[in-house]
Amino acid sequence: MSADYYEHLYCVFCYCVLGKVEARRCYDKKIRTVVRGGLRCAVCTACLEKGLYLERVLNAPQPVYQGSIEEPDPFIQKACIRCMYCGGILTRDEKDRHRYFEELYVIFRNQVLGRCYTCTRHGMCSAPYRANATG
C-alpha cells in the first residue's frame, strides 16, 4: 500500500477530501480506513489532533509501568503504541527514549499512548497529564 491509496478518500469527521499531503501523513502514521455511508474514509490531520486533544482532556490517564532500564517490558517493545499528540506510531528508538528518560506511557480508553520524538522536540515535554498520573 502506498500514499496514493489514501488520496481522494474522505475525512471520517469533516468529510473533506484528503489531498496528497494528508494522504502521505495517513500513510506515514498507518491510519486505518473505514467505510461510513458507503464512502471509504481516513482522517485529516486537523481532525486527528483535535480528537487526540479531546481524548487527553476528557479521559483520566492511567500510568503504565514499562519495565526497568535493564529489562524492558516485552509488551511495550512489541506493541503498536501511538503518540498522544499527533497519532503517529512510536518507533523502537522512541520507546527506548521513554525507558531511558523514565517518561510515562499512559492508557486512555484501553489504548497505550506515549510521545514521539517530534512532539517532544516541539515543546510538549511538560505534559499536563504528568501531575495527574503521579498521584
From Swiss-Prot:
One of its GO terms (biological process) is symbiont-mediated suppression of host innate immune response. A zinc finger (unnamed) spans 11-47, 83-119. Its main location: host cell. GO terms for cellular component: host cell cytoplasm; host cell nucleus. Signal peptide: none annotated. GO terms for molecular function: DNA binding; zinc ion binding. It is found in: Host cytoplasm; Host nucleus. InterPro entries: E6, E6_sf. The keyword Kinase does not apply. Keywords: Activator, DNA-binding, Early protein, Host cytoplasm, Host nucleus, Host-virus interaction, Inhibition of host innate immune response by virus, Metal-binding, Modulation of host cell apoptosis by virus, Transcription, Transcription regulation, Viral immunoevasion, Zinc, Zinc-finger. Plays a major role in the induction and maintenance of cellular transformation. E6 associates with host UBE3A/E6-AP ubiquitin-protein ligase and modulates its activity. Protects host keratinocytes from apoptosis by mediating the degradation of host BAK1. May also inhibit host immune response. Forms homodimers. Interacts with ubiquitin-protein ligase UBE3A/E6-AP; this interaction stimulates UBE3A ubiquitin activity. Interacts with host BAK1. Belongs to the papillomaviridae E6 protein family. This is Protein E6. It comes from Odocoileus virginianus papillomavirus 1. The gene is E6.
